[in-house]
Amino acid sequence: ISVILNLSKDHLDRYKNIKNYILAKKNILNNGGKNINLISIDDVYSNRIFLDKKIKNKISFSIKKITADICYNKDCIVDNYFHKNKKIKLLNISLDLNNSYNLQNILVSYIVCKYFKIPIKYFNESIKNFKGLPYRSLTIHNSKSKLIINNSKATNISSSLSTLENKKNIYLILGGI
């Protein structure tokens, strides 16, 4: 299974330019005869890879576009790949569903479970009990007037911004050099 969650110019430190970066990611795909390729269509570069007709055995997923094979919409996973418009309600999840990376990881986990015919109850149990990575969008304090989040795991602008999505009245403290 190959997965492309996102492509961002923040990742260009290892590549000469965006074209080389996209080519490197494409090389991950189609490495095996029965390989399945899970590709987010939420950013322009990943979407471009998904639309490439040379890429086979692909499933699109999205937290923004309901046209994807598997998408997130109104607290539900909407499955249009394995089923026709099946909705799976996400209940009792300890992860912050306002963060795009958590939602993307949940969608990918769902696709992998369906692909390997793992019963949905194990998927639900796993995401219900998953606590997330240390220091990644860790809620320190939550009250009516304040929400304090430690996201020191964020290593670039994109990962920092994903934590701030859907938040209001933000006071951002940054450190490091």
Show which residues each predicted segment covers.
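Residues that form or immediately flank small-molecule/cofactor binding pockets and catalytic motifs
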Residues: 42, 63-66, 132, 142
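Short, acidic/turn-prone active-site loops that include or flank metal/cofactor-
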Residues: 7-10, 62-66, 154, 175-177
